[in-house]
């Protein structure tokens, strides 16, 4: 009988294995790791009838027990799509899919909103799901954050509930690359700046992956304020273009924009005031327009959209307020895992700001981030594996504020609190500009630790 092997015991791998097993597909899982936590995950799947092999690297030898029956291999987002072993399997006639493709097969009867982009996609995903749900639609979110798409499919099957009206799915370049048959009803492209180049090689390759999702969408929505997307506009026919800056971005008419009086407008009339969304920053005005365009495409009235915007609580780890320490408002922006996202967060702050930055550095242009540091920051506290590299970048940009180095976030928070008080900062911001994997499982774990440390400081002051 045709066999499927799932590579990786992470969240997406577990979800894919459980979904395949529940839908009658013989499935096994391999993972190169070992240890107590991984063994617990493996045992949980074994109890559900899924064979799991640990300490099994991504090599042909790991697949030999099933090679005669092997029909498909399902990879987690962290596995390179062009890995030599996967190419070997393809040459043997084995199909290679990502977890998102498995989920699509089970969920394609429900209309999807597929949201991608270098930055902004998490906020747009949360906000759109919230607006739709507030309007009475069942529109759960998942994908690259929260519940994996495979877990969502499995939960819907097991609960035997009425199918949702919409699925609001955040899709990373890794997921899109490994699931080219996904065809969303609505596709949203938030931004495009260089990221994940260590995986994709070039900006052109990275762009092409994201573009593919929008080309396969029935209706596409674009952020005309993003320089890269704006340069591509001539190559697109149709779609909805939004701008928080102008009714005529780069000489082309926008379909939805914010006018000089602060109102969201379409080509026929003003719709509602943009202040309906109380989140700071120009980037969130762009996010507001992308969500509004999608909600109107789905059929919501301006009044319903406004009600959802006004009740939106915000996104964890994205400029998330964490109270005050002295005169400084504290923000958790752990989701800022690259220079561009960190610069966007800094732009939304009122200075002077004490910034905590660090982690695993990524390839990318740091120019905009360094400019914002010079403009807004009175002090920068560095921590983690990228400390020396970031220190060199910041000193090379002639930063005139305090610049200190610490080994970890705990000691960095202590230093940042001291600096904020001594320098009279109005904001204290965790804005790593780096991935979290040097010291944390993911950016959520890093942000949660930051909030815990801040709450400890606040408790000591009370």
Swiss-Prot record:
It catalyses: UDP-N-acetyl-alpha-D-muramoyl-L-alanine + D-glutamate + ATP = UDP-N-acetyl-alpha-D-muramoyl-L-alanyl-D-glutamate + ADP + phosphate + H(+). ATP binds at residues 117-123. GO terms for cellular component: cytoplasm. It is found in: Cytoplasm. Its EC number is 6.3.2.9. It is an enzyme of class 6 (ligase). It comes from the Bacteria. Keywords: ATP-binding, Cell cycle, Cell division, Cell shape, Cell wall biogenesis/degradation, Cytoplasm, Ligase, Nucleotide-binding, Peptidoglycan synthesis. One of its GO terms (molecular function) is UDP-N-acetylmuramoylalanine-D-glutamate ligase activity. InterPro entries: Mur-like_cat_sf, Mur_ligase_C_dom_sf, Mur_ligase_cen, MurD. Pathway: Cell wall biogenesis; peptidoglycan biosynthesis. The keyword Ligase applies. GO terms for biological process: cell division; cell wall organization; peptidoglycan biosynthetic process; regulation of cell shape. Belongs to the MurCDEF family. Cell wall formation. Catalyzes the addition of glutamate to the nucleotide precursor UDP-N-acetylmuramoyl-L-alanine (UMA). NCBIfam families: murD. This is UDP-N-acetylmuramoylalanine--D-glutamate ligase. It comes from Parasynechococcus marenigrum (strain WH8102).
């Amino acid at each position: 009988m045709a066999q499927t092997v799932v590579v990786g015991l992470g969240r997406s791998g577990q979800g894919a294995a459980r979904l395949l097993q529940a839908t009658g597909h013989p499935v096994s899982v391999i993972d190169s790791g070992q240890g107590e936590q991984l063994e617990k995950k493996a045992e949980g799947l074994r109890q559900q009838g899924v064979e799991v092999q640990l300490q099994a690297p991504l090599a042909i030898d790991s697949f030999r027990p099933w090679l005669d029956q092997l029909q498909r291999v399902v990879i987690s987002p962290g596995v390179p799509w062009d890995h030599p072993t996967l190419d070997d399997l393809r040459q043997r006639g084995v199909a290679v899919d990502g977890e998102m493709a498995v989920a699509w097969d089970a969920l394609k009867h429900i209309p999807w909103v597929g949201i991608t982009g270098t930055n902004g996609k998490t906020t747009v995903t949360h906000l759109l799901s919230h607006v739709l749900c507030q309007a009475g639609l069942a529109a759960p979110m998942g994908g690259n954050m929260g519940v994996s798409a495979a877990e969502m499919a499995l939960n819907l099957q097991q609960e035997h509930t009425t199918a949702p009206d919409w699925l609001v799915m955040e899709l990373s370049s890794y997921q899109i690359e490994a699931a080219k048959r996904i065809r969303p009803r609505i596709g949203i492209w938030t931004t495009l700046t260089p990221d994940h180049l260590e995986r994709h090689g070039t900006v052109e390759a990275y762009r092409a992956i994201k573009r593919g999702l929008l080309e396969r969408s029935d209706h596409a929505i674009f952020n005309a304020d993003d320089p890269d997307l704006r340069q591509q506009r001539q190559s697109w026919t149709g779609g909805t273009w939004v701008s928080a800056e102008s009714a005529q971005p780069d000489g082309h008419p926008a379909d939805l924009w914010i006018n000089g009086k602060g109102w969201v407008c379409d080509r026929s009339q003003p719709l509602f005031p943009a202040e309906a969304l109380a989140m700071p920053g120009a980037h969130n005005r762009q996010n507001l327009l992308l969500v509004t365009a999608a909600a109107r495409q789905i059929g919501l009235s301006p009044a319903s959209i406004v009600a959802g915007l006004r009740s939106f609580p915000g996104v964890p780890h994205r400029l998330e307020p964490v109270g005050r320490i002295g005169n400084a408002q504290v923000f958790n922006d752990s989701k800022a895992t690259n220079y561009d996202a960190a610069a966007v967060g800094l732009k939304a702050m009122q200075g002077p700001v004490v910034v905590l930055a660090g982690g695993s550095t990524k390839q990318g242009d740091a120019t905009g981030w360094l400019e914002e540091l010079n403009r807004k920051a009175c002090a920068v506290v560095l921590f983690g594996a990228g400390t020396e590299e970031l220190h060199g970048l910041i000193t090379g940009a002639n930063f005139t504020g305090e610049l200190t180095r610490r080994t970890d976030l705990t000691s960095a928070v202590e230093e940042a609190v001291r600096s904020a008080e001594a320098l009279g900062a109005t904001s204290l911001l965790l804005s790593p500009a780096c991935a979290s994997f040097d010291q944390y499982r993911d950016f959520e774990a890093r942000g949660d630790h930051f909030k815990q440390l801040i709450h400890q400081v606040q408790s000591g002051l009370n």
